[in-house]
């Protein structure tokens, strides 16, 4: 989300296109309550810092606008790419991320692609993987999808970053295939030496190839080779 002046102006234009005028916006948002009535469209701002509760009508429209703005950018990028290439076009989805309406994004993608980072310490993670895989296949009308990102080990952004247990990387990879994935990609190949994701696991960790992570990566790759016949199903 962006709350700058340019985004605020675009939000107001979107509202006028949707509702017609500021009076209709007032009615839709119920601004008479708590004396929030707007007299001019220029008074309307994105839902920035508030001393108390946000207006839910304003919040809903703001999130719909934010989704529209991002999706419009992808549409423009898709148009440019398509002028020069007939290769499949996609972008990273993030499971059931609540701020984007993936049902509207899916028609822009030639193949549905997802990022998935369940917590290895969460006993519900297997259910989340199954649900997320089914959602992706549903967004593609039953077609196979692509796992764009998963971690071979621990991430770096949770309060507690649990490593994957032995065999868990293979198990979760196979689970994605069972729920319709046609390809499995990892983030990242070699663990970063510096930067914000220094402690995010890589296929080749800081300890090198003589490590449990690399052993799991190799065994998972061998398993995927043996499952090649199910490609496209």
Predicted regions and their residues:
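Carbohydrate-binding surfaces of carbohydrate-active enzymes
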Residues: 37-48, 75, 83, 95, ...
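Polysaccharide-binding and catalytic clefts of secreted carbohydrate-active enzymes
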Residues: 1-111, 115-131
């Amino acid at each position: 989300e962006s709350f700058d002046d340019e985004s605020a102006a675009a939000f107001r234009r979107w509202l006028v296109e949707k509702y017609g005028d500021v009076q209709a916006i007032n009615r839709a948002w119920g601004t008479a309550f708590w004396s929030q009535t707007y007299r001019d469209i220029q008074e309307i701002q994105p839902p920035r810092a508030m001393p108390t509760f946000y207006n839910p009508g304003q919040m809903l429209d703001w999130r719909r606008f934010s989704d529209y703005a991002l999706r419009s950018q992808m549409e423009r990028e898709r148009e440019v790419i398509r002028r020069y290439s007939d290769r499949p076009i996609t972008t990273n989805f993030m499971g059931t991320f609540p701020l984007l309406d993936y049902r509207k994004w899916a028609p822009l993608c030639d193949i549905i692609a997802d990022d998935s980072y369940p917590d290895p310490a969460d006993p519900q993670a297997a259910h989340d993987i199954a649900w997320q895989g089914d959602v992706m296949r549903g967004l593609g009308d039953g077609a196979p999808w692509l796992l764009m990102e998963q971690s071979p080990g621990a991430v770096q952004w949770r309060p507690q970053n649990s490593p994957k247990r032995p065999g868990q990387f293979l198990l979760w990879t196979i689970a994605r295939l069972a729920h319709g994935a046609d390809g499995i990609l990892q983030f990242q190949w070699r663990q970063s030496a510096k930067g914000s994701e220094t402690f995010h696991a890589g296929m080749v960790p800081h300890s090198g190839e003589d490590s449990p992570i690399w052993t799991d990566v190799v065994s998972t790759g061998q398993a995927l080779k043996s499952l090649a016949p199910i490609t496209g199903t």
